[in-house]
Amino acid sequence: MNYVASNIQVLKGLEAVRKRPGMYIGSVSINGLHHLVYEVVDNSIDEALAGFCDRIDVIINLDNTITVIDNGRGIPTDIHEEEGISALELVLTKLHSGGKFNKGTYKVSGGLHGVGISVVNALSSFLEVYVNRDGKIFRQTFSKGIPTSKVEVVGESSVTGTKVTFLADSEIFETLDYNFDVLEKRLKELAFLNDKIYISIEDKRIGKEKSSKFYFEGGIKSFVDYLTNDSKAFQSEPYYIDGFINDVIVNVGLKWTESYSDNILSFVNNINTREGGTHVMGFRSGLTKAMNEAFKNSKISKKDIPNLTGDDFKEGLTAVISVKVPEPQFEGQTKSKLGNSEIRKIVEVVVYEHLLEIINLNPLEIDTILGKAIKAARAREAARKARESERKKNAFESLALPGKLADCTSKNPLEREIYIVEGDSAGGSAKMGRNRFFQAILPLWGKMLNVEKTREDKVITNDKLIPIIASLGAGVGKTFDITKLRYHKIIIMADADVDGSHIRTLLLAFFFRYMRDLIENGYIYIAMPPLYKIKYDNRIYYFYEEKEKEKFLDSIETKNRNSISLQRYKGLGEMNPTQLWETTMDPARRKMRLMNIDDAIEAEKIFVTLMGDLVEPRKEFIEQNALNVINLDV
């Protein structure tokens, strides 16, 4: 298929982009800055999906410009008949002017192709593009979306491809400081989803020099292996499904582990569909249908076994679903949920038919997986009975709030906050030091449950977790309803030592598995009590970081240092109620860390590594991150 100027169609102009950048890239924060890089890379990925590109290089240059190079066909440079300008200039200056809008050019497209690169141009103070095509090297430059040069031939070339260099506009973006790790993770994800494509990233900034290269022969199978390499698996390698119906390509990798939770990632045209959609619904129904058939035909005794559901078959399952759809319909501006109704049946048929073949070829492994599903079904029944029993006793309702909870008087969830505090002594100080109008205190005691190693029926009846579930008032697991939440700030307050860190991680794992909406909606915080108290010159100073304390000490003349009194806080219990209020609980002065899931894939891996059964991966992770553990955000 030829890719020339006539393939480029124009829908409308670029005027609004600089006025309302958030409508096109989500925000003007660092997330929007990274979005510019993704849009340019997505154009190169489109060439790869069409079979014309197998290498993409991304460079963060010394001056904070970004360069993206691919070996695709090169953007067309001939004159567009309708517009009377070169296709290259058209693609970079007109919104909705890309090969994506002509079905013959790209059957499927990630990113916005045309929308994306023109938006990048509009939001860059400088953009330069080189095109290797038709034996020549073409060049054109732009500023804030406006051409500053004509398309000119600057040399000869025996290869094809496109090189884009841009400088994001400092008048629009809050920062131009790219985060290498964030970009690296996205490029690694793209390399997993598009097998046999070489993708590299290099940071040339002084003091930040590093680079990574990705190439995965196994594609999605490699992705599943990466996600499960810290878990005990039932299979020697992932099962792989590859099929297509009506130009829709379906690729799925599956692997069952001994975990009690599932991890299903879904993508449409390389876009992470975090909210799922019709492709995920089709996967679940195809999986359930095939596995029920496998159970029916197996020699496993059917006596006293509850009906097996999709949730039972999903226990311990890690799956990556990737579909390529010619005309995807995404619900919402963020492209996080697929809406095409026809995709559900297509994915269901492909998954069902291919999974039946896999089942026939792997009878022993499938029997083991079915055995796990049966245990999950029995645990599900036990959890249902436990819920009903607890419901009858009002254990999860506000009428039966735990005795240790010191509640606040405000009835407005928007202003109410609850401190979940490690230890009775610290809980006592917190109760006395708090503002009783809007601050509630729930002390924790004893050993906290590790939910990564526990089935749901044991979780919802655990005597350490029931007080948390009851206090929050919104249910747990599948019955969790965030609209019933009694507090809009949930603050974990624990000692700044190894035990405190362990308790924080256990609580975060519980919220991640059973109340993930709390993290995704920004309701979970970590309290940051001070590490040091210094008395000097009749004044008291509190310091929350080692470097803050050192900077303060360095500012004091040597002759006066004998008059300094320094205390290192080992635990919350060392502070009296007034000190705890002033340093850790007063909204005007306290420091807290908001927990969020910028990267759900990495969050999943971290919890499995830290809380799972395998010791070696946990040891490696701790050794690699020991120096950064205070800054570990999940």
UniProtKB/Swiss-Prot annotation:
Ubl conjugation in keyword set:
no
The Toprim domain extends over 416-530
The residues that the entry says bind Mg(2+) 1 are: E422, D495
List the GO terms this entry assigns under cellular component, sorted alphabetically. chromosome; cytoplasm
> One MF term from GO for this chain?
ATP binding
The main place the protein resides is cytoplasm
* GO annotation, biological process: DNA topological change; DNA-templated DNA replication
Q: Where in the cell is it found?
A: Cytoplasm
Record's miscellaneous remark: Few gyrases are as efficient as E.coli at forming negative supercoils. Not all organisms have 2 type II topoisomerases; in organisms with a single type II topoisomerase this enzyme also has to decatenate newly replicated chromosomes.
Family statement drawn from the similarity comment of this UniProt entry:
Belongs to the type II topoisomerase GyrB family.
Q: What does this protein do?
A: A type II topoisomerase that negatively supercoils closed circular double-stranded (ds) DNA in an ATP-dependent manner to modulate DNA topology and maintain chromosomes in an underwound state. Negative supercoiling favors strand separation, and DNA replication, transcription, recombination and repair, all of which involve strand separation. Also able to catalyze the interconversion of other topological isomers of dsDNA rings, including catenanes and knotted rings. Type II topoisomerases break and join 2 DNA strands simultaneously in an ATP-dependent manner.
Record's protein name? DNA gyrase subunit B
Q: Name the gene behind this protein.
A: gyrB
